[in-house]
Amino acid sequence: MIKKEIIILCGPTASGKSYLGHELAKAYGCEIINIDSMQVYREIPIITASPIQIYNTGIHYHLYNFLSITEDFSVIKYLKLASEKIREITARGKIPILIGGTGLYINLLVFGYNNIPDISQDVRVQVRNLHNEIGNIELWNKLEKLDPIAATKINHCDTQRLIRAYEVLMHTGKSIFSFHTAQKERILSDFNFKIIFLNPERKFLYKTCDERLDKIFKDKAIDEIALIKKQFTPKEYANLKAVGIKEIIAYLDGNLTLNDALNVAQMRTRQYAKRQVTWFTHQIQDKTILEYSTQEEFEQILRNLLFTLKS
């Protein structure tokens, strides 16, 4: 059986993924699927530079801005939704293009995931309340008594992994590492993935990061976050990790000037982009790397891709 093809455009923030994907989709009738963990939320299209906020030319976009920040969501739920969209698109004879920079989503979608059941909202709330009450060290001590294998592999300072391990234990009665050693589930094993990694030269990347944040701050991002502060509690928007949100909140609370908020957000965006480049370089092995150091070189890459796909 000939496997159908999926294109993944990945790379650091502000590297031109959305523009490149939009132009490819426009030329060949492809449909675009989001693979960015923050662009799923409907309340923050500006601060996350959602492409459906930028482009409005009839291209079919999927899994963008469809979820409220108050709704429970997980990587497993994302994988199920994305795989459904991929099969729907290919059944129509179209090629899906997945665009984003969330490495975890890409890695699990392509290479498979450990089939840990979805953690119930009740368990999530209970564990987080417990953590808020007793802190990392006491939670780690509890984990050590119930799951010594996990405790030996998780540092008590690693809050995210610690909470995750305790959630899995409470929900399933099993160690999280029992799932890690099981065979991975590949929900799209009948597809071929063509992974294209955009890797701009560092100086050029930092320039585009700064320019993006400057534009976002001028493009009503302040109003967007102010509305979130008005409509939701701090607990409800605490999990929004998109760079710029924390800085704008600090500005709205009077703790930073607008210029300082922008400068801090730009610095954090550059740091985030650097981490993304490092992750994609080392974690995704089978990929096509596109390197460029000017906008002109980037435009030439687009022309080359259009020609390659046409042939």
Curated annotation (Swiss-Prot):
Transmembrane segments: none annotated. Its cofactor is Mg(2+). Its EC number is 2.5.1.75. The record marks 102, 124 as: Interaction with substrate tRNA. Residues 36-39, 160-164 are annotated as: Interaction with substrate tRNA. InterPro entries: Dimethylallyltransferase (IPR039657), IPT (IPR018022), P-loop_NTPase (IPR027417). It is an enzyme of class 2 (transferase). SUPFAM superfamilies: P-loop containing nucleoside triphosphate hydrolases. ATP binds at residues 11-18. Coiled coil: none annotated. Substrate binds at residues 13-18. The keyword Transmembrane does not apply. Keywords: ATP-binding, Magnesium, Nucleotide-binding, Transferase, tRNA processing. GO terms for biological process: tRNA modification. Signal peptide: none annotated. GO terms for molecular function: ATP binding; tRNA dimethylallyltransferase activity. It catalyses: adenosine(37) in tRNA + dimethylallyl diphosphate = N(6)-dimethylallyladenosine(37) in tRNA + diphosphate. PANTHER family: TRNA DIMETHYLALLYLTRANSFERASE. Monomer. Catalyzes the transfer of a dimethylallyl group onto the adenine at position 37 in tRNAs that read codons beginning with uridine, leading to the formation of N6-(dimethylallyl)adenosine (i(6)A). Belongs to the IPP transferase family. This is tRNA dimethylallyltransferase. It comes from Rickettsia typhi (strain ATCC VR-144 / Wilmington).
